[in-house]
C-alpha cells in the first residue's frame, strides 16, 4: 500500500548556473553585425577598471558583491530609507523607489548618509537598524504639535513631531483577530494544506484560494490574480509591481467592509462573549472595558 501511495515529494524552486560564454560587441548596436572578436564579461570599462570575470563564473556572485560593496553606498542609502519609511510613513527621500535625478531630494541628507554608513558598519543588519530607529528620540516623540511647528512645518517633513498613521491592511486584520482572542500566534509552518499548483486557475475556473485562517497576516500567501479582499480595500500594493510607497485612501467600501465583513463580525462576537462572561461588571463597566480594550 505504501508503494502504491507514496507520500508527496517536497519540492522547491531553485536556481542553477548555466554555461557562461563570452559575447561579441554589436557594431553600432545592431545584433546582426557582431564584431569579429568576443569580449570578456566585466563591468563596463567606461565606468570601472575592474578585472574581467572568471571564465566559468555566471557573474551573479560578482554582481551581488558590486551591489553590496562599501564603495557603493547607494544600496545602503536606499535600504535605510525604506526602513525609515516603514516606521514613519514617509522616507527621508519621499520617492522611495526613485533615488535618481527625477526623485525628491532628501529632507535630512546628513542623517541619511550617517544611517547608511552605520548600517554597513553593523553588518547590514535590518534588525539592528530597526532597534536603532525605534529607540531614537525622533521615533518616540508625541504626535502633539505646537502652533509654531504647524505653521513652519505643516506636513511634518522636518519631523518636529511623531506622524499620525493609519493602520495598514495586515496589522488591521491581525488587530481584529487579536482583540477577539482569535489570533493564532504560531511561528512558522503553512497556512494551507493543499499543493501550490491548486492556486493556479484551471480550465474549469476552480479556485482553491481561501483566507479563512487565524494565522498572522505575515503567513497569508499573496496570489497575484486573487488578492485577499481586505488587502485590496485597504491599499495593499499591486503584487505584480514594485511599490515602496503604499497609497492611503479613504473610500466608502472600507466602511462597508468594517460593518459587514464576516471577519469583523466574528471578531466582535468573540469580544462580546468574553465581556458577557465577566459577571462582576455591569453594562456601563462593560462599555468602558470595551472602549479601553479596543
Question: Which residues fall in each region the model found?
Answer:
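Primarily short, surface-exposed interaction patches in extracytoplasmic proteins
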Residues: 1-214, 231, 237-246, 259-294
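Short beta-strand/turn segments that mark the catalytic/cofactor-handling region
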Residues: 216-222
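Short Ser/Thr-interspersed hydrophobic loop/turn segments at strand-loop and sheet-helix junctions
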Residues: 223-227, 235-236
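Active-site-adjacent segment of 2-oxoglutarate/Fe(II) JmjC oxygenases
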Residues: 251
Amino acid at each position: 500500500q505504501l508503494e502504491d501511495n507514496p507520500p508527496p515529494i517536497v519540492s522547491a524552486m531553485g536556481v542553477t548556473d548555466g554555461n557562461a560564454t563570452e559575447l561579441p560587441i554589436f557594431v553600432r548596436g545592431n545584433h546582426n553585425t557582431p564584431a569579429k572578436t568576443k569580449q570578456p564579461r566585466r563591468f563596463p570599462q567606461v565606468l570601472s577598471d575592474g578585472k574581467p570575470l572568471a571564465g566559468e563564473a555566471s557573474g551573479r556572485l560578482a554582481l551581488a558583491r558590486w551591489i553590496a560593496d562599501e564603495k557603493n553606498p547607494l544600496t545602503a542609502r536606499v535600504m535605510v530609507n525604506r526602513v525609515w519609511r516603514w516606521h514613519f510613513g514617509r522616507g527621508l527621500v519621499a520617492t522611495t523607489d526613485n533615488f535618481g535625478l527625477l526623485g525628491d531630494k532628501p529632507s535630512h541628507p546628513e542623517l541619511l548618509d550617517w544611517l547608511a554608513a552605520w548600517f554597513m558598519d553593523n553588518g547590514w543588519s535590518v534588525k539592528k537598524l530597526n532597534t536603532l530607529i525605534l529607540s531614537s528620540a525622533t521615533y518616540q516623540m508625541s504626535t502633539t504639535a505646537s502652533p509654531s511647528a504647524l505653521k513652519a512645518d505643516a506636513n511634518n517633513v522636518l519631523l518636529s513631531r511623531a506622524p499620525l498613521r493609519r493602520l495598514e491592511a495586515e496589522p488591521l486584520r491581525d488587530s481584529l483577530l487579536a482583540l477577539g482572542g482569535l489570533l493564532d500566534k504560531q511561528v512558522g509552518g503553512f497556512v494551507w494544506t493543499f499543493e501550490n499548483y491548486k492556486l493556479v486557475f484551471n480550465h474549469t475556473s476552480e479556485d482553491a484560494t481561501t483566507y479563512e485562517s487565524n494565522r498572522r497576516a505575515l503567513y497569508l500567501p499573496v496570489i497575484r490574480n486573487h488578492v485577499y479582499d481586505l488587502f485590496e480595500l485597504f491599499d495593499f500594493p499591486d503584487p505584480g509591481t514594485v511599490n515602496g510607497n503604499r497609497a492611503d485612501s479613504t473610500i466608502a467600501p472600507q466602511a462597508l467592509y468594517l460593518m459587514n465583513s464576516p471577519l469583523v463580525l466574528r471578531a466582535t462576537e468573540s469580544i462580546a462573549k468574553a465581556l458577557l462572561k465577566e459577571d462582576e461588571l455591569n453594562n456601563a463597566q462593560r462599555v468602558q472595558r470595551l472602549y479601553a480594550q479596543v
